[in-house]
Amino acid sequence: MYVVAGHKGHAEIVAKLGRAGRRRRLKGKRGRGTLTDEKPPIFGMLQRDGEVVIAMLPNVQRVTIEPLIQQTIQAGSRVYTDEYDIYNQLEQYGYTHKTVNHSASEYARDEDGDGFHEVHVNTLEGFWSLLRSWFRPHRGISQEKLPRYLAFFEFVHNARRRGKALLASLLAVLVTP
């Protein structure tokens, strides 16, 4: 029987699911994941200059995601998202909110006519590609350890952007008695 990576080491979960094995080549069901499913949702926010915040969430409901957005993103900031309905109320919280409509094959939009496509989420899509390729050699990560892997990847990604300033602050902490 094929065991999904999120259930590795948890025979009681697999037995409780009572599901038959599946072929590896078949794609899983499409849609947004939940912790009770085999693919927990990972939420990410990325500044255009490269700083990223990622977190594994129990679900993708507005009550879960909006507090995280409000804690992380300063009011008055521009926020670019897809048209998922949980983002509809961002303007009520003081954000300038622009969307791209992926279902209509819109991936970037030039709003002011200068030839530069300002409205897009391609930077974050590129980050997800990096994260997936980084996960690939691990061949499955349990749901218990996934937040640690995410935190490590977030740290490495952000530290790479900070460079010498991060190294200097780490050394200052280590040297200070």
Residue ranges and their predicted role:
Residues 1-177:
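Residue-level recognition of single "structural anchor" positions
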